[in-house]
């Protein structure tokens, strides 16, 4: 795929289109990072785009935040409180669900009135309520929704796991154990009513997410497609490994794995399976433990340091993309034993840096890693196969080939011009139905 040709073609037919990207945060979390990258991709490729957030972190002129007041914190606390009361006063799954019972009306804002297309991303935890979403849909403006998780097409959960109630009717949510009002049913029914007859397009970041969305009763009658998240391949690119290691204080003489997550202790991130895989390597691959180390990236990295049977090098959470790219280049392999994921930005970033990846066969991960071509896709929840994947990828005679293939795959699929072009087509289709 000639990405440069796509970018030129893209810019020649864009005429006066204004897009408002809406996300809870500007920089924190995978959805925020993806939304921010799309903002820059659109603006660099012929579309006038702005981003509206609740939690602003920079002074970027294209990023705007809603008026700040005590109500924002109150909205968040009120929503958590209602969930807590309907969950038998338990904190279990407190942040795995959202009921969108409080938020901010953005339809009155000048930024909303300015836009031709409203592009919603992750808007939970007290940013937009169901009432707010209803007003957005009722405005008559085309609405595009990027599915960073399942919330838009389930009742209240972000990931349904083995539950398939969202296909027909969410009720008696297995994530809540309280006997109060059926929150899942109430929210599902409300979404069903407000989606009906509206100019609404759903975009999954992965084919897996789009396929799940198509099975939901909530998306029937609406377009569902998939477009991957964009990445800046001029930032995330191959660099000198030893220079990167020196800068981050990492040993020059070891093969290094990288594991990272915003919350390493989040069970969905699968850290326990990485521990098991490393234990298997220590027992069954005697030559590796002497030369192998694990870099753990995340705010709570120190808390898991003792769990791994290999030397561990901790790095605090990095928000600067250039430093993150350096860290990917400093290691030999990125490992992501995630148990449930959509289209992890981390895999795309690592591949763009020429760093092969090992992950489980789950969610959108097998769409990203081509098994034994640019990385290794291990059997789901199989720590032994995960260990085999690590060993296989680290073989000196194949690592360079995997690295080159990973970079090529990232350029072909996730470069900003290619992703921006595909979103432009979605926007134009939505506008044609206005």
What residue spans do the PLM features occupy?
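Nucleotide-activated donor-binding/catalytic signature segment of Leloir-type glycosyltransferases, i.e.
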Residues: 285-291, 296-325
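Conserved donor-binding/catalytic core segment of Leloir-type glycosyltransferases
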Residues: 251-269, 275-279
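A short, well-ordered alpha-helix in the C-terminal region of glycosyltransferases
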Residues: 398-413, 419-425
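Conserved acidic donor-binding segment of nucleotide-sugar-dependent glycosyltransferases
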Residues: 371-372, 376-383, 392-397
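Short hydrophobic beta-strand element within catalytic cores of glycosyltransferases
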Residues: 356-359
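Short alpha-helical donor nucleotide-sugar binding micro-motif in glycosyltransferases
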Residues: 326-331
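A short, active-site helix/loop in glycosyltransferases that binds the activated sugar's phosphate group
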Residues: 154-159, 178-224, 231-235, 241
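Aromatic "clamp/platform" in nucleotide-sugar-dependent glycosyltransferases that forms part
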Residues: 339
């Amino acid at each position: 795929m000639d990405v440069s040709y796509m970018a030129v073609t893209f810019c020649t037919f864009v005429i006066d289109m204004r897009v408002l990207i809406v996300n809870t945060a500007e920089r924190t979390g995978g959805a925020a990072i993806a939304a921010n990258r799309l903002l820059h991709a659109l603006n660099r490729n012929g579309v006038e785009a702005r981003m509206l957030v609740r939690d602003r972190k920079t002074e970027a002129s294209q990023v705007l935040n809603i008026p700040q007041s005590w109500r924002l914190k109150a909205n968040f606390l009120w929503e958590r409180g209602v969930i807590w009361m309907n969950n038998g006063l338990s904190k279990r799954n407190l942040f795995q669900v959202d009921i969108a019972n409080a938020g901010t009306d953005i339809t009155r804002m000048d930024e909303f009135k300015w836009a031709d297309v409203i592009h919603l991303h992750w808007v939970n935890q007290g940013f937009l309520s169901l009432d707010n979403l209803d007003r957005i849909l009722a405005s008559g403006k085309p609405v595009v929704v990027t599915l960073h998780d399942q919330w838009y097409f389930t009742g209240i959960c972000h990931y349904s796991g083995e539950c398939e109630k969202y296909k027909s009717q969410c009720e008696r949510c297995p994530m809540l154990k309280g006997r109060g009002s059926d929150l899942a049913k109430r929210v599902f029914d409300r979404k069903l009513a407000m989606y009906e007859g509206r100019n609404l397009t759903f975009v999954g970041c992965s084919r897996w997410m789009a396929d799940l969305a198509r099975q939901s009763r909530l998306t029937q009658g609406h377009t569902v497609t998939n477009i991957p998240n964009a990445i800046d391949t001029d930032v995330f690119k191959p660099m000198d490994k030893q220079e990167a290691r020196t800068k981050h204080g990492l040993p020059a003489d070891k093969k290094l794995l990288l594991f990272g997550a915003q919350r390493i202790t989040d069970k969905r991130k699968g850290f326990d399976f990485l521990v098991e895989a490393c234990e298997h390597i220590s027992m069954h691959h005697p030559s590796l433990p002497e030369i192998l180390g694990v870099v753990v990236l995340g705010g709570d990295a120190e808390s898991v340091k003792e769990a791994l049977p290999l030397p561990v090098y901790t790095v605090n959470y990095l928000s600067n993309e250039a430093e993150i790219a350096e860290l990917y280049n400093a290691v030999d392999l990125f490992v992501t034993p995630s148990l449930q994921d959509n289209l992890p930005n981390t895999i795309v970033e690592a591949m763009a840096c020429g760093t092969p990846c090992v992950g489980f066969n789950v969610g959108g991960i097998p769409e990203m890693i081509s098994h034994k071509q640019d990385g290794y896709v291990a059997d789901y929840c199989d720590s032994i196969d995960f260990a085999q994947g690590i060993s296989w990828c680290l073989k000196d005679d194949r690592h360079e080939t995997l690295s080159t293939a990973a970079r090529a795959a990232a350029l072909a699929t996730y470069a900003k011009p290619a992703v921006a072009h595909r979103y432009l087509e979605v926007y134009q289709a939505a506008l044609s139905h206005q």
